[in-house]
Amino acid sequence: MLPKTGVTFSCDDAALQKLFDEAERKCLHNLKDFGADTVLVEGGGYEKIWLETQPMGGEMYWKRNMTAAMNNQLLFMRTQRADGRIAGSIQCHPDGTIEPQFNKFQGFCFPLHALNMWYLSGKEPAYLDMLADCLEKFDAYLWKTRDSDGDGCLESFCVYDTGEDNALRYGHAPVYCTTDTPPEDADVVPMASMDVTSFSYACRDTLSEISRLRGDGRESEWREKADAVAANLKARLWDDKRHACFDRDKHGKTIDVLCHNTLRCMYWGSISQEMADAFVRQHLLNPQEFWTPLAVLSDK
């Protein structure tokens, strides 16, 4: 049984109270029934649950609706393909059918939040086992299908693998990719990707922590495997002179576009503190690149 949760807020400022109450009311519209399961969709016209946002969104909403918070993790685990691939998005159609969509990865804000929900929901052993199995299978899938040149960096096959709508650095890459092999006749993909490589790091990093919690003797094994991914990412995609990560195209050529994705690597933990500090110092705090008092709009 899930623990009971709730949120209350009251203040003497009538305008602030009205704003809070309206925000709570608006957010209730994002609770949707996907069959028998209540989930929290992204909102703003986005009626699916996406792997890039909604495991995180579910965790953020746990005090208000624990059931939805858990379902935002469980639906991705329950709809995982037999070969290990996790759906990039899950949609509930008007007739009530649930469609897990495997035509893109669409980011990977999942392992950390799914593990956090284990703590918040009461530390059920079966849930932890289910999460570990899911992550191990997905990691294996990634290395089976996304390192076509064997360079130790995992690849993006389409624009929506990394959720970068209209990104020019993808060239003529397709928006979606439904195959487990690279698209033919594309000029950039398969792209050695800091994002997709970090997906594996996040899986292995979380599996190391799960192993510690379960005491199954594999903590060090997963830690070493995670560190190996981070080392490959640094060796192939990090530029020491420019203090940022840069993806490589299908020919191994560096894609010379400075983008915010190194920040994503910070989130996944796939780059070191030293690398993160250098990126912040050289770019986020650099007034010659943008007006530093304001957040980078793409990052915002």
Please describe what each predicted stretch is:
Residues 39-40, 52, 110, 134, ...:
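Short hydrophobic/aromatic segments of transmembrane alpha-helices and their interfaces
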